[in-house]
Amino acid sequence: MAEISSVPFAEPPYLRGLPSPYYNESHRRFQKACRAFLYENLLKHAMEWEKAGTVPEHVFSDFCKANMLLPNLPAPLPVAWLKRLGIHDILGVKVEEWDYLHTGIYSDEMARSGLSGPSGSLTAGFAFGTPPIIKYGSKELQEKFLPDLLTGKKRNCIAITEPDAGSDVAGITTTATKSADGKYYIVNGNKKWITNGIWSDYSTMAVRTGGPGAGGLSLLVVPLKNYPGVTMQRLKVSGQITGGTTYIELDEVKVPVENLIGLEGDGMKMIMNNFNHERLTIAVGVTRQARVALSTAFSYCLKREAFGKTLMDQPVVRHRLAKAGAELETMWAFVEQLLYQLTNLPKEEADRQLGGITAMAKAKGAMVLNECAQTAVLLFGGAGFTKQGQGELAEAILRDVPGARIPGGSEDVLLDLSIRQLVKLFKAEEKKLGKARI
């Protein structure tokens, strides 16, 4: 349904008529248009497609025609490029007016089916593979790739993770060595768990152009589909089934040196900045998934009877719902605040001040999703353990939880990173003020 739900926990407070300092008329108009579009083109079929394991190809084209892939880019949008391509608005919002609160609305609405796979099958590669080209790519590189990527004529993905290097980005071993004539990088290695990889024409790939450690990493646009030396295999995963998770083998792959993004050795810096956007949008999306899980269970508890009364009449059930609900609404307040701060800070300042907090938000969002999904499955009982019937959505959301806790930086790594970043920021501020260090 595209209407606003009255079920407790089903909607963010601002959509239930409660006052909010964050959203202006542009945001509210976009939310209505976004919900209507997504319901017709994605959400009402999401469970059917997830069960089938694939989203029809025309859906990606439908999103491109409506400019509905573009909200996945960091705000502010690349206005000059979009206008050059004849793109002036997204569902009525002028591209130059787009901010991170619009992005948050989009990410929230995209997850309203409760399933991350169908939406991720369309957006993940574009969302995280395209921004480095926009931000760091040379003029020639942008001219070569952006027209087709921004209009959806070609697809790309982000390829960082390897079989033996996930959150430890500095440990990747895929190499890119220059050919004797200096015209090509020869790429060898493997990438694993690459979302959307199987459908991608290109990947923004982390490669090792130098020695060990972070300083030896670079980013390279590597052709994938039907390209010599590239073999791709779709992986079977427990959740996010429609996401196109892919294993990529690279054997003597010749990539033009012009496909280098930025400078050799700057890969780690670019990857880390790119992670901020990825982690924020994940945090928003998983918070909506948590909403779907908890509100679905809430509705079920109002009608399901046990021991002569409804589940909702059982104090222990209300206690479970209250604990999960408190976590959920606290998390939403956290991400709304982050979205507002990102909207009102220059990008460089936001990266400096909010990188650690964004990592914390992504980790906490996944924890909240786990709490709400576990609660929902327990309250559904046997129905929550069944891949059909009234508990099938709660069951599917619980299988999505590892896909929230691991990608984009695993939970424990991000919690540690968040504090290290805050300590670093604190010491820099203290030094600037001339105070003693801790």
Swiss-Prot record:
Associated pathway: Secondary metabolite biosynthesis
EC number(s) from the headed UniProt entry: 1.-.-.-
Class of the enzyme per the UniProt entry, highest EC level: oxidoreductase
Molecular function as annotated in GO: acyl-CoA dehydrogenase activity; flavin adenine dinucleotide binding
Transmembrane segments annotated in the record for this chain: none
Database matches in InterPro entries: Acyl-CoA_dehydrogenase, Acyl-CoA_DH_CS, Acyl-CoA_Oxase/DH_mid-dom, Acyl-CoA_Oxase/DH_mid-dom_sf, AcylCo_DH-like_C, AcylCo_DH/oxidase_C, AcylCoA_DH/ox_N, AcylCoA_DH/ox_N_sf
This protein's name: Acyl-CoA dehydrogenase apdG
Species whose genome carries this gene: Emericella nidulans (strain FGSC A4 / ATCC 38163 / CBS 112.46 / NRRL 194 / M139)
